[in-house]
C-alpha cells in the first residue's frame, strides 16, 4: 500500500496533527525504521508518535509497530532464533544510535515495495519472516549424503561446523557459534 510509504505516511500524519507541509517522518521505504523530525518539541513528538502508532497498528498490512523505547526495554534474545518473538527479533538488530524511532513490520507475504516501485527500489533489507530470514547454506563434498538441517542456524555456526567436518580441533569456549550436524542419519 503506497499509504505506508514514508512520504504518504508523513502527509497523512502532518495533516492530522495540524502541521501540513512539514516533514515529520523520515524513512527508507514502507517497512523498517521510521524516524521523527528532531526539531519537534516533546509535545509535538508525542502527538506525532501517538497518531502514527494508531494509524499503522490499524492498517491491515501491518503485523507490528514497535517504539524505540519498547525495543530498548526488551532483553536481548537468547535461544534458537526460530523461537524468538517479533520484538525479540527487532531487539536482535537494534542499535540505539542508529535505529529508528519506530520499527514497522509488515505481515508475511506483504511486499514492502508497492506497485510502480517507490524510489526505483526493487528489493528490501528483508523482514522478520522465515522467507527472508532463512538463507540456504550449502555444504558439499564427495560422498556426502543430502541432509537438511531443520533448525535455525546463524552464520557464526559455519566455522565450527566446517572445522568438525575436516577434523580440525576448535576450542568451543573460544569461538562464537556451534557445531551443526551436517551428516545425514542418526547421531
Regions found by a protein language model. Give the residues of each.
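Secreted, luminal/periplasmic, and some membrane-associated catalytic domains
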Residues: 1-115
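Substrate-binding rim/cap in mid-to-C-terminal beta-strand-loop elements of soluble/periplasmic
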Residues: 1-46, 122-166, 181-186
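Short, surface-exposed acidic
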Residues: 21-22, 170-175
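Acidic carboxylate-rich catalytic motifs and surrounding loops in phosphoryl-/glycosyl-chemistry enzymes
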Residues: 68-71, 173-178
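Short proline/glycine-enriched turn/loop segments at secondary-structure junctions
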Residues: 91-94, 125, 170
Amino acid at each position: 500500500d503506497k499509504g505506508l510509504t514514508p512520504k504518504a505516511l508523513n502527509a497523512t500524519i502532518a495533516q492530522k496533527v495540524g502541521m501540513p507541509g512539514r516533514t515529520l517522518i523520515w524513512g527508507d521505504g514502507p517497512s523498517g525504521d521510521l524516524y521523527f523530525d528532531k526539531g519537534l518539541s516533546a509535545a509535538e513528538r508525542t502527538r506525532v508518535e501517538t497518531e502514527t502508532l494508531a494509524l499503522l497498528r490499524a492498517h491491515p498490512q501491518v503485523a507490528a509497530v514497535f517504539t524505540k523505547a519498547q525495543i530498548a526495554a526488551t532483553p536481548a534474545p537468547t535461544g534458537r532464533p526460530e523461537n524468538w518473538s517479533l520484538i525479540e527479533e527487532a531487539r536482535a538488530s537494534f542499535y540505539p544510535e542508529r535505529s529508528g524511532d519506530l520499527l514497522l513490520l509488515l505481515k508475511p507475504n506483504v511486499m514492502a515495495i508497492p506497485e510502480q516501485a517507490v524510489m526505483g527500489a526493487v528489493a528490501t533489507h528483508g523482514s522478520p519472516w522465515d522467507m527472508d530470514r532463512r538463507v540456504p547454506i550449502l555444504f558439499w563434498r564427495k560422498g556426502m549424503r543430502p541432509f537438511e538441517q531443520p533448525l535455525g542456524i546463524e552464520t557464526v555456526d559455519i566455522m565450527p561446523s566446517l572445522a568438525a567436518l575436516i577434523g580440525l580441533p576448535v576450542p568451543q569456549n573460544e569461538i562464537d557459534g556451534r557445531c551443526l550436524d551436517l551428516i545425514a542419519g542418526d547421531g
